[in-house]
């Protein structure tokens, strides 16, 4: 149930087209008082009455008027007021900081062939890698989110590798961690004016997922273990993993990447507001 007294943070926003051809907006709002989530929608007429920037992830809104839809467990927004606008993503200084950290981790790869391959991929796509999000709603859904998520995973990897009692290949860990979400630069678009994040329609016609992109890239270049780690980093087939970690005799590196990816996605700086709370 929505409240006109409480403030709401925009968690995610996307637009869709109905079967009749009408445009509609979908929002996930977080009640800043209770922490509860609210699924919302706006019909095209109401959507057009608001600035596109109103629904930027991280924005703080007040619901002025809406209708609760108990049968669908959502509410139809009619009018909202923007209370505080969130920034779009990383600023130049933050981007430079995370980019330099990424380069420092790539330099830790001792195998020259593997290091040069990773560096080539990241350098070739650096403009996109610096601004693309890591997700639409789940985590790091802001400009520069992919860069932040990747560096966080590398930090978790560095901290935890020495704790593994079994033998693991550090070069493969650093390489797979750096490249595991590279495919997201082709999978997502972000509007640098409004912050709206959308899927690239043509991506899924060429690749099933960003995991498949990374897997194919590394496998065709001769880095089989790195490819396998990327294939398994979602953990379970029903979560999008190409290799399900429920299978027997899985190499420890495959579990490792999945676990550190999950830690960043749940406990890292998953939204831009967290950068202003330091």
Q: What residue spans do the PLM features occupy?
A:
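OB-fold single-stranded nucleic acid-binding module
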Residues: 13-24, 36-39, 45-89
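Histidine/acidic-rich helix-loop-helix segments that form or flank divalent-metal centers
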Residues: 174-177, 187, 192, 200-205, ...
């Amino acid at each position: 149930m929505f409240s006109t007294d409480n403030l709401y943070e925009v968690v995610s926003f996307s637009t869709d087209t109905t079967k009749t051809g009408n445009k509609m907006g979908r929002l996930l709002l977080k009640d800043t008082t209770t922490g509860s989530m609210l699924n919302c929608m706006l019909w095209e007429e109401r959507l057009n009455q608001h600035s596109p920037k109103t629904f930027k992830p991280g924005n703080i809104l007040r619901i002025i008027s809406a209708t609760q839809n108990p049968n669908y467990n959502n509410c139809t927004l009619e009018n909202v007021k923007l209370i505080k606008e969130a920034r779009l993503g990383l600023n130049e200084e933050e981007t430079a900081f995370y980019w330099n950290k990424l380069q420092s981790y790539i330099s830790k790869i001792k195998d020259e062939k593997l290091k040069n391959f990773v560096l080539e991929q990241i350098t070739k796509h650096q403009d996109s890698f610096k601004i693309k999000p890591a997700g639409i709603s789940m985590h790091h859904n802001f400009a520069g989110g992919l860069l932040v998520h990747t560096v966080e995973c590398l930090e978790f990897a560095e901290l935890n590798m020495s704790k593994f009692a079994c033998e693991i290949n550090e070069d493969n860990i650093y390489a797979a961690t750096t490249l595991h979400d590279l495919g997201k630069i082709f999978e997502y678009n972000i509007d640098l004016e409004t912050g709206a994040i959308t899927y690239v329609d043509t991506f899924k016609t060429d690749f099933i997922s960003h995991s498949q992109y990374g897997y194919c890239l590394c496998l065709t270049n001769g880095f089989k273990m790195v490819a396998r780690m990327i294939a398994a980093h979602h953990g379970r087939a029903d979560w999008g993993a190409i290799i399900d970690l429920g299978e027997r005799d899985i190499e420890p590196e495959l579990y490792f990447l999945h676990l550190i990816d999950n830690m960043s996605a749940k406990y890292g700086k998953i939204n831009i507001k967290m950068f202003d709370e330091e």
